Swiss-Prot record:
It comes from Homo sapiens. Belongs to the cation transport ATPase (P-type) (TC 3.A.3) family. Type IIA subfamily. Ca(2+) 1 binds at residues 304-305, 307, 309, 796, 800. The modification Phosphoserine is found at residue 581. The active site is at residue 351. This is Sarcoplasmic/endoplasmic reticulum calcium ATPase 1. The gene is ATP2A1.
Amino acid sequence: MEAAHAKTTEECLAYFGVSETTGLTPDQVKRNLEKYGLNELPAEEGKTLWELVIEQFEDLLVRILLLAACISFVLAWFEEGEETITAFVEPFVILLILIANAIVGVWQERNAENAIEALKEYEPEMGKVYRADRKSVQRIKARDIVPGDIVEVAVGDKVPADIRILAIKSTTLRVDQSILTGESVSVIKHTEPVPDPRAVNQDKKNMLFSGTNIAAGKALGIVATTGVGTEIGKIRDQMAATEQDKTPLQQKLDEFGEQLSKVISLICVAVWLINIGHFNDPVHGGSWFRGAIYYFKIAVALAVAAIPEGLPAVITTCLALGTRRMAKKNAIVRSLPSVETLGCTSVICSDKTGTLTTNQMSVCKMFIIDKVDGDICLLNEFSITGSTYAPEGEVLKNDKPVRPGQYDGLVELATICALCNDSSLDFNEAKGVYEKVGEATETALTTLVEKMNVFNTDVRSLSKVERANACNSVIRQLMKKEFTLEFSRDRKSMSVYCSPAKSSRAAVGNKMFVKGAPEGVIDRCNYVRVGTTRVPLTGPVKEKIMAVIKEWGTGRDTLRCLALATRDTPPKREEMVLDDSARFLEYETDLTFVGVVGMLDPPRKEVTGSIQLCRDAGIRVIMITGDNKGTAIAICRRIGIFGENEEVADRAYTGREFDDLPLAEQREACRRACCFARVEPSHKSKIVEYLQSYDEITAMTGDGVNDAPALKKAEIGIAMGSGTAVAKTASEMVLADDNFSTIVAAVEEGRAIYNNMKQFIRYLISSNVGEVVCIFLTAALGLPEALIPVQLLWVNLVTDGLPATALGFNPPDLDIMDRPPRSPKEPLISGWLFFRYMAIGGYVGAATVGAAAWWFLYAEDGPHVNYSQLTHFMQCTEDNTHFEGIDCEVFEAPEPMTMALSVLVTIEMCNALNSLSENQSLLRMPPWVNIWLLGSICLSMSLHFLILYVDPLPMIFKLRALDLTQWLMVLKISLPVIGLDEILKFVARNYLEDPEDERRK
């Protein structure tokens, strides 16, 4: 049934053809079940394990590696002699890498619990219905409830469907619907229609929503919608329709993979075609087929060389280390790739309650009457420090501390706050904080009483647990609460009837203490309290009181005001009818006005600084709240989102105002606005969508079930540690301390991680460029193989992998939060950097080939062949006079490969030092700024020595131990790469860098 809230109870009953007293007939139940289906949320069909495994092989680079492994495997079958074992090592290692990668990928996907499944926890098991086949109420499974059913709910029940209330069977009906609307206090419900068909859920005061809890009272209602038709069902559908986009880094790596795979394919084909003339060379036994296979193997080696196999592992490690650092700052990251996305966040959409504010209501102002002289009324105004539930703070008058016990009016005000109250404070020893027990508003009054300490109770020697309610206990010992007249909507107040305790010798009789909305309470006051006397409440005095309340309730503070009053001579208890709430109004008359307290949910202390940090970092903060617009704008001014006197006409909207704009203007509003008030969850998703259309990277906070679709849609969904399981499972990050400042710290960490990742991705890629150049040169010049695939795999995975991981520990730049967010479209490697890495890669390739050639041409223990013999080694036979006196086996010796590999590894270690900073010289940023990098270089070199000097590794890798002369040659060839990169950095710093960047550095 659509818009049930706007219809009368009679219309709702008529729509389903049902009687409130008897309920649906079995026939109607059957028909409605067929029409509307079961009252449950359908489970989401997850991917099968096999589908997840297949998904891991959709990446182009992975497919190329898989193809290379298969080809290597086939070629290994054709190997002869002692080469057979080494031939199988390469495909085996590649397959191991791919399997490990797939396992990690599948594990991560499986671990991301399903937010839709988490919604199930809000589905109640049972419901109580009236049906025509039974005289009394019956308990049935909640899934069998159908639209039209007459349902009964009572305190403690979970609402089984979306229900239009027909009758309230208690004084009041309070519902905790925070999971759905984010309202921190329970909501009082009624039965009258809400005539606005577009009312937001917060305003549908005659509806009960599926999954919410009855906090107090008992009611009867008719089921309007079930299953996916409910508000919680709509949230489920929104979440199911939201596709997870790839993070900017994943997109960059995908693009890079595609480009790389095209380049690899071209080079492999080129190498094979260049050497067609050599297929018949004698070294292949004159067999064209064997020649083709040989060059095919070289092409495969090229593919292996060009792909940075270690990259996925290094990225995962770097992100995992980042998440550990973030966890120490109270940001728990649930999805690894989102660590990097945080770095390009350009907009943070934050909830107000609990994130920007403490979510701990606190009284910050109060007033009592000081003097009434004719029409002149003077007030005593006080301010109170302390913005949490902790009983710590001072009462100030004109900014100077005062002792509240010296003011009779404050003693009475404290008495009303303590007695007209069902809440208390509790010290949570595990967390070391004071928490509320009961309603937030009442707990604020309890805390106020503790801060005022009107009877000067000695609290210094008390433990924190005893301190929690010490001053309230003193007041409760003086007066005994007899009974409570519950809050009701018509009078907007509640009261308690108290009698003096036996032990108290004070000459006071019974009293009624009242608290409630100022306009309602003051209208029923005939007197005002001045000191210990009461004087009549005249028109001018009332105007003065209401003027102050209006001033407090608007403007910068927008405080929530409560009026406190006493009925000095209430009727006798036996004369009062307590089971008829309609008569409570007549008992709460002839009141004496005592004072007013103004409270608010105060901003967190550290938020203002964090918002300034965001402004410096080019990040826009948008506050989104269910509160009214005035309160929202006031908090924005208080924390620095808006300036003190800034005009906010086109920068703050309510959900209704936003909906009334044409679509183009809605989109434009999202570009400007910094405050959205009175919003529904659907608005959050819409705002994210519009921001994404401007290529903004959005972080969205939320804690309720209602926030889950927007959390899932935003690039970074941030759930509160105190939030619902659904919000947490739909998000990428959870704030353990619910604090906005933690988001800013996480963004800073994300930026640092991206900078470091850029360094090691470039480091690994320049290494691969070097390997490709090496293989291409040997093939193009007709030289013997300098590096074989198994050696390339070792370098890519192990010796390069360790320094690359250590580069993730580079310290962040000092000005990291003074720059605007990077564009998600910014390429990983720009034009100049591409040239730089080609230059370095070219040197690496040439040096590696040069080291192998040096052994053939000049080494003492080498064959001393000439250059022509070296480039035509394929034609070497015993009969060929050009190779007279040369053993043809020498061209397959392991020494030149060892020289080439050692040069490659040493250059890579130098390159790792070059990667400490993109443009800073090693003289400005010495190696010891990252001690992890030095350690990893030592470890990589140790592993290189291991495969050179420890049997049987040299046989597997086709290597031979080097002597001192050869090592000196390796260093001579390798070290110039540092000088080359220093020259390139110098050019970048002085001739290419943006002057703005220069100034910032």
